[in-house]
Amino acid sequence: KISLNTEKERMLTMRFTCEKSMLVAGLNIAGRTVAQKSILPVIEGILCRAEVGLSLTGYNMETAITYDIEADVSEAGECILPARLFGDIVRRLPEGPVTVVVGEDYKVSIRAGYASFTISAESAEDYPELPDVNTGRPVKLPQCQLKNLISGTIFAVSENQGRPIHTGVKFEVTNDSIT
């Protein structure tokens, strides 16, 4: 008998615990950019990285959102979780801590209270590389100022997808102002 599995695949690959409410919030935000149907099935999933905390990434080959969550990580690792299925399961769990364990052959155990689910994940190596966006100087401004900027311009944004260029707001940043 020949085993094609590597030793790493047979071991525990990731384990973390976090609050259900934080996990739901992260899935709601990162899930906004997950592709619903794609010729590249891995982008229908959420890239889940557990290191110091938990990082959830959704990407549709145009837009990416990464959401960081406080989590107790006992075993660092990463995998791709099926976004819709994982989100549906987490939303139905009881309130409190949720423990996710990714083990042998990317079998995922999700536990909270008396509830327990098992699903399959995929290797994070299959996830497309995200574009580098750290090319400029970061801009910091209070949340209320950003909200006022958006509120003052959002009325002019088109909802018609026929001309995607009109469905966004352009920010121009100079040394001392944002317009």
Question: Language model features by range: what are they?
Answer:
Residues K1-T179:
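Structural preference for solvent-exposed beta-strand-turn elements
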